[in-house]
Amino acid sequence: MIRVLVTSDPNYKGYTSWVLFKETLTNYLSKIQFEHECSINDIKILSNIQMAIAWARKNNVPCAPFKENWNDVDRVIAFDSGNPKMRKRIDKAKSLGLLVDVTFITLDKQ
């Protein structure tokens, strides 16, 4: 089972669009499947993001909340709007060799 952390800025209230989010997540998960020669059923999503949890449930992919334990993480997919806390998390993922990719997102101005 490959455990994939899907993470975003902690105070970020939404995404540019659901369509963009799910397409991006699907593309990155396909990349992981190719790298590890596995199926989507061999992946477990770790996330506290409602959209990631909804995506996982809709696609019958196991998911669980991320408990800040980096030993539980095999790969990281990040959605980043430039928050300094998020940059630290991305740097940690890079230093551990876990980062799949980063998608830069814009904050909703509402």
Residue map of PLM features:
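Acidic/glycine-enriched connector segments
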Residues: 8-110
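Residues that mark the start of a beta-strand
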Residues: 1-5
